[in-house]
Amino acid sequence: MFKIFVKINAIKNISAILIFSLLLLSCEDNDSSIKEIVNSDVEWQFTNIDDSVLDLELLKSNLSELIDSNYLRAIAISYNDQLIFDHYKIGDADKRYPVYSVTKSVLSAAFGKLFDQELIENENMTIDAFLNMYDYNDPEIKSTISVKHLLSMQSGIQDDVNYIRSDTPIKYILDQNLLYAPGRFWNYSSAGTHILSAVFQKITNENPESFVKKHIFDPLEITNYFWEVDANGLSNGGWGLYLTLHDMIKFGMLFSNDGKWNSDQLISQSWVNRSTSKMRAFRSGSGSWEYLPDNEAGYGYLWWINTVGDNEVFSALGYGGQYIVVDKTRKLVLAITSKESSSISYRRKISSIVFNDLIPIFPAAPPSNN
């Protein structure tokens, strides 16, 4: 059985940054009141692990580099399904943190549940099966956009985050010209994932937030969360989710265990494997790829994938330095939340420490009966 723990102790451009900042200030219940009161004292207490398993002094040394940063809010690590460390530099165990594009990976999990329940036939279904494309400009080409294109960031939809300020956000997005024919190139687009949210609602007659609550969050006992909506009340598919640090860990643990939580298969193993497999490969480590180390990275279905040693590791990543990193071989999950104002150098430091220093010191987890 998993130990459910309570321990008391778009990555894009300047315009996107401004929009995100406005959202933080304007949303009714967005936790913009996060108090920037810094806790500089670190209690170096590692639980559920000892020196016979891991060099704890080396772990402490690597963690210290992150914790000393002015941008870090909180960090937690679980190993072999148990929390071994957490630290709150800003906030506490009850604080909901904005996780930005980590939201996309949660939406991906929700789509996995749709496929598991056979509510959608396959990923190649085009969005004109769910949305009347003749309500928008250039319906012929946009009718060829598939669910797979949207899940893998290959739809050609522009990454214009101003949709969240529109009274008609879906029309705002789909009236714009495509950057390229669907399926031709990879291009990160929060607007595209908001179209996914609209497709999801059409399939289920339910807001993604409500569906996720019933089928994923409730079984994980995730109750202290918030999900922003657009002008029409639709869950924002691009960003907008707020989670506690431990709930970020829980979501990662669900995927580290192939979609299983306790005795319940919440999401099929086949979807976990498919959604965290590379649909597109590209070189990271420069420009906007400061969130991942400088190696051959890739993108799955709203998950980022890169290699650590011989293992593929996948991550839910959010603007400013929000991370849920999962290494299934090690049964290792790291959750990191950072200030939105974090610098590129800070995010590159996270990338280097997490993927080059922290993860490799953990051994593969022993076989589990869970």
Regions found by a protein language model. Name each.
Residues L23-S26:
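C-terminal motif of bacterial Sec signal peptides marking the signal peptidase cleavage site
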Residues E28-N30:
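Bacterial signal peptide processing site
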Residues N62-D92, I324-V325, K331-A335:
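A short, well-structured edge-of-sheet supersecondary motif
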Residues D81, Y97-E123, L150, L196-F200, ...:
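Active-site SXXK
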Residues Q117-M153, D175, T204-W239:
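Active-site helix/loop module of the DD-peptidase/beta-lactamase fold
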Residues Y134-Y163, A181-P182, A191-G192, L243-H246:
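Conserved catalytic neighborhood of penicillin-recognizing serine enzymes
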Residues I195-V199, W239-K260, Q322-S338:
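Active-site-proximal alpha-helical segments within enzyme catalytic domains
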Residues I222, T276-V333:
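Active-site Gly/Thr loop motif
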